[in-house]
Amino acid sequence: MNIIEANVATPDARVAITIARFNNFINDSLLEGAIDALKRIGQVKDENITIVWVPGAYELPLAAGALAKTGKYDAVIALGTVIRGGTAHFEYVAGGASNGLAHVAQDSEIPVAFGVLTTESIEQAIERAGTKAGNKGAEAALTALEMINVLKAIKA
């Protein structure tokens, strides 16, 4: 039986982070968590991290796809926050971001880590950006690094 598992240490990884400006008071914490995980745990060098800001979560798939197509990156991390309001807008934005990012990963065959919070309230978002529920930006970064190594092992 062959079992493929991988660790997250990836010192030579080239990683792009695309991040939404909308709700940046939360997204800034996601970004801090992602960068900390990349550098401290993944051992990724500063010069191998690119950050691309977009207006909102709905624009993340387009930027992630453009980054993936360059061939310069081993993974893309998408960060953003969508908070439910009183209209159906939440479903459209959250669904569009989620489905779009999944398509980018499948089409590009590089990891696209989903670090987009979809919450019922600002309080829930804050909890997931570094307080009670950990930092989902850091978790997305670790997922990206592990998947880089998993794909390398599969192709080896």
From Swiss-Prot:
Pathway the protein acts in: Cofactor biosynthesis; riboflavin biosynthesis; riboflavin from 2-hydroxy-3-oxobutyl phosphate and 5-amino-6-(D-ribitylamino)uracil: step 1/2
Domain of life: Bacteria
GO terms (BP aspect): riboflavin biosynthetic process
Enzyme class: transferase
Keyword Membrane in record: no
EC numbers: 2.5.1.78
One Pfam family from the record: DMRL_synthase
Binding residues annotated for 5-amino-6-(D-ribitylamino)uracil, in chain numbering: F22, A57, Y58, E59, T81, V82, I83, F114
InterPro entries in alphabetical order: LS, LS/RS, LS/RS_sf
GO CC list: cytosol; riboflavin synthase complex
UniProt entry keywords in alphabetical sequence: Riboflavin biosynthesis, Transferase
Residues that, per the record, bind (2S)-2-hydroxy-3-oxobutyl phosphate: G86, T87, R128
Molecular-function GO term, any one: 6,7-dimethyl-8-ribityllumazine synthase activity
Alphabetized Gene3D superfamilies for the sequence: Lumazine/riboflavin synthase
Protein purpose: Catalyzes the formation of 6,7-dimethyl-8-ribityllumazine by condensation of 5-amino-6-(D-ribitylamino)uracil with 3,4-dihydroxy-2-butanone 4-phosphate. This is the penultimate step in the biosynthesis of riboflavin.
Family of this protein: Belongs to the DMRL synthase family.
Assembly with partners or alone: Forms an icosahedral capsid composed of 60 subunits, arranged as a dodecamer of pentamers.
Record protein name field: 6,7-dimethyl-8-ribityllumazine synthase
Lineage, broadest ranks: Bacteria, Pseudomonadati, Pseudomonadota, Gammaproteobacteria, Enterobacterales
Gene that produces this protein: ribH
